[in-house]
């Protein structure tokens, strides 16, 4: 009994101090990046404003959120799973974790962002961009103009996507990867009620067998 209690205490300490996520078994859906090429909307939505059409899509490692008592830390560590292939974090319905400005809701709110290529990105707000770092509306980052900032495990992401040897995944911008390239065309807030029938969106693009490498000088 003593050994079992000691084991449990050690596991709790590992979670709190190590800053990692291991709750895969609690999620109902696995994540496959190729599903985004032919995505099916499962939930009813309401269309909301597109605050800007910026194409830049940056990222942050989820370990940068360190305040254990914060809503975002608790959400990341209790509601999300790390995909050990791509490094994305996702929720039980396959929505990808992102940081958004205060313009777009609260931690845990979910959205469909449609790009001008037709790609639909199912996103869940797991972190919030600081108001002092965004425009007056809380929409986009003042320095890089990004609205979408993926919350990732940069170890796995760095192995899956290219980094040019500079340590930055996709030169710091997921817009450099063919699937995510494009401006924001439409934003819908996801409601809890599911659609009676899925709505299918198909992106007419041959899925590359190898990872495409796009080197855009500055990375944006």
Regions found by a protein language model. Name each.
Residues 1-36:
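Gram-positive cell-envelope targeting signals
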Residues 28-220:
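Solvent-exposed, well-ordered loop and adjacent helix/strand elements within mature globular domains
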């Amino acid at each position: 009994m003593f050994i079992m209690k000691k084991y449990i205490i050690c596991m709790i300490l590992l979670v709190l101090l190590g800053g990692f996520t291991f709750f895969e078994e609690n999620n109902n859906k696995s994540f496959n990046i190729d599903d985004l090429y032919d995505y099916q909307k499962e939930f009813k939505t309401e269309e909301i404003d597109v605050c800007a059409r910026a194409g830049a899509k940056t990222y942050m490692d989820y370990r940068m959120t360190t305040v254990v008592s914060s809503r975002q830390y608790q959400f990341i560590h209790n509601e999300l799973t790390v995909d050990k292939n791509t490094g994305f974090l996702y929720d039980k319905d396959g929505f990808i974790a992102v940081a958004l400005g205060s313009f777009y809701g609260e931690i845990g709110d979910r959205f469909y962002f449609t790009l001008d290529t037709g790609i639909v990105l199912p996103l869940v707000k797991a972190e919030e961009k600081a108001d002092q770092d965004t425009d007056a509306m809380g929409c986009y980052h003042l320095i890089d103009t990004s609205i979408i900032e993926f919350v990732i495990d940069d170890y796995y992401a760095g192995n899956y996507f290219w980094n040019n040897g500079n340590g930055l995944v996709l030169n710091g911008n997921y817009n450099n990867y063919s699937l995510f390239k494009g401006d924001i065309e439409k934003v819908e807030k996801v409601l809890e009620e599911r659609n009676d029938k899925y709505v299918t969106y198909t992106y007419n693009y041959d899925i590359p067998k190898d990872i495409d490498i796009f080197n855009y000088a500055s990375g944006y």
